[in-house]
């Protein structure tokens, strides 16, 4: 009996320590940098983007944002799941205010959890702070005398996505960035659609992983159908405020000409 009590005590302490570690991991503030050389950027100055997705219940850390600002991004893109059910409107707005301090345009696309929030309240916050919202549409973006396009696809899980509508006005000769919360958008893209960069989140990198095993793959970069892509682990968590083997992350993405 005494041995079993000791074992139970050891297991309890170990479980508590592991939970504390997972909680601390979930509160991390990591800024990853990526450089995508693209043929359409030849002869143009580099374009730098701060990309963040899956914020959920977190407040974006000010020191993290200061570090990101040091890269002088031209654009901020929120890849969906800015919030979820139960997140106070004041916290959502505070996160937007913190991003507004970059002093550059902010683009937002919807994630599945954003639909758990009162839509009129989200729109009110976006309108108050000049956030550009994309729902199956595209907008031009100019920097340093050059113009690119950003297309945003609405959430796939909520069956709100209309990819063809989002890209219908794109000029294949110019640089085109596609933003969709769910990386399953890769399946809808054709090689001749003129998409150069795809930014997504949603998966949280599995959020809780045991070695190579998790509900989703870790976030990553790569090439699919002639487009460079980034799938982010995301910044926040859902269900439980814990992470294991899938650190939270935000991103500085630099698009430049080939060497």
From Swiss-Prot:
Keyword Signal carried by entry: yes
Entry's Gene Ontology cellular component terms: membrane
GO biological process: lipid A biosynthetic process
Coiled-coil regions, chain positions: none
CDD domains xref list: MPP_YkuE_C (cd07385)
Amino acids binding ATP: 214-221
Disulfide feature: none
GO molecular function: ATP binding; UDP-2,3-diacylglucosamine hydrolase activity
Keywords: ATP-binding, Nucleotide-binding, Signal
Signal peptide region: 1-19
UniProt induction comment: Transcribed under partial control of SigM ECF sigma factor.
Domain of life: Bacteria
Name under which the protein is recorded: Uncharacterized protein YpbG
Gene: ypbG
């Amino acid at each position: 009996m005494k041995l079993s009590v000791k074992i139970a005590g050891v297991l309890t302490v170990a479980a508590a320590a592991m939970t504390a570690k997972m909680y601390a991991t979930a509160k991390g503030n990591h800024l990853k940098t990526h450089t995508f050389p693209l043929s359409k950027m030849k002869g143009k100055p580099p374009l730098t983007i701060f990309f963040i997705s899956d914020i959920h219940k977190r407040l974006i850390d000010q020191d993290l944002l200061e570090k990101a600002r040091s890269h002088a991004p031209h654009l901020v893109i929120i890849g969906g799941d800015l919030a979820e059910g139960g997140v106070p409107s004041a916290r959502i707005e505070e996160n937007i205010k913190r991003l507004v301090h970059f002093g550059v345009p902010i683009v937002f696309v919807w994630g599945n959890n954003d639909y758990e929030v009162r839509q009129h309240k989200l729109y009110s916050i976006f309108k108050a702070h000049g956030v550009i919202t994309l729902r199956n549409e595209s907008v031009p973006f100019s920097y340093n005398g050059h113009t690119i396009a950003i297309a945003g696809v609405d959430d796939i899980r909520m069956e709100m996505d209309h990819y063809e509508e989002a890209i219908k006005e794109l000029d294949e000769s110019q640089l085109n960035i596609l933003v969709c919360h769910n990386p399953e958008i890769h399946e809808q893209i054709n090689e001749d659609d003129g998409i150069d960069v795809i930014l997504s989140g949603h998966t949280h990198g599995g959020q809780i992983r045991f070695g190579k095993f998790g509900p989703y793959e870790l976030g990553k970069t790569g090439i699919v159908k002639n487009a460079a892509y980034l799938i982010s682990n995301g910044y926040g968590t859902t269900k439980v405020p814990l992470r294991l083997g899938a650190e939270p992350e935000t991103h500085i993405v630099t698009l430049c000409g080939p060497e």
